[in-house]
Amino acid sequence: MNSKFTWLDSYFYNPNLIQKCLAFLLLPLSALYLVLAVLNSKFRKKQDFKIPMISVGNLTVGGSGKTPMCKAIAKFLKKECLKQEIYIVLRGYKRQSKGLKVVKFKDEILCSVNESGDEAMEYAYCEDISCVIVSENRSKGILEAKKLGAQVILLDDAFSKFHIKKFDILLENTIRPYFNFTLPSGAYRLPLCYKKNADFVALEGDDFLRYSMCKENMKAILVTAIAKPFRLYEHFIKARACYFFKDHYKFKKEELQNLLKKHNCDTLMPTFKDFVKVKDMGFKTQIIELNIELKDKLKNAIKKYIKDSDEACKN
């Protein structure tokens, strides 16, 4: 695909007239979805796993920077909170395996990207994260993390897991959906009023800064399969051509070879999430690094939570 917006991105963030009409036609389904989501949140009893847990989530579908935020928090926990055994538990979206799987333990990666999913494999390459566990059942993943020796557990995309007692960081980005509807008429998985359930609403610019790095290379083509690829807009002019695929797309070697040949290029310019899927294909790569810097208010909130949790666990 060769557009800044996939169809879904356009539908949720920059809809044309037909997409707007479709959104209104789907409102009855959104109402049903909303009722089910609210019921799920109200009647789940919270379970305390007796270990510090930080969840990074958002209200909308698609990318919001959860992965770089989790990596930034892991780095902060290790450097400033003196926590060495930082584990992460996530679903492992679009992986070709089922059930609980330990992707990384200590410094050893234990499975392929197909088995782990691209997000989990990106975490596996993060030196600040000691263990990566994928599991559709987060509770089972948490128990496995405790058994393996976790000091702090990060939960990727777990804001909606209301049955787990945790410190919820909710990311709020500067780019917001066109409509404030829940799925399928809008991009929201939960209504906006659920922001009040978060322990910390992290506003881009106020509580964290997002930055990315990559040098210009006119012998490269930018290829990515992340949600909201327009987030990479500053890098579009750094490559000879740009190709955007659906989120979590599994790249094919021949397909990428043809794109390089078409533009007379010799280098791919992927994000790290894309890189883990193409690294064994033999291509020359120049990675776009997506990073987040935590600001003091968020750092202090995390520090206080860790301190309070450590004291509670001792009692």
Predicted segments, located by residue:
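Phosphate/Mg2+-binding loops and adjacent switch elements
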Residues: 94-208
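Generic hydrophobic alpha-helical segments
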Residues: 73, 138-145, 256-259, 302
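Short, well-ordered alpha-helices that flank and scaffold nucleotide-derived cofactor binding pockets
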Residues: 71, 75-79, 125, 144-147, ...
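Residue-level signal for inorganic ion chemistry
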Residues: 32, 67, 123, 156, ...
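ATP-dependent carboxylate-amine ligase
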Residues: 1-12, 19, 79, 83, ...
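Walker A (P-loop) phosphate-binding motif
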Residues: 38-107, 207-211, 315
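Generic structural signal for residues in well-ordered beta-strands
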Residues: 86, 131-132, 285
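A transmembrane-helix-recognition feature enriched in membrane-embedded lipid enzymes
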Residues: 2-53
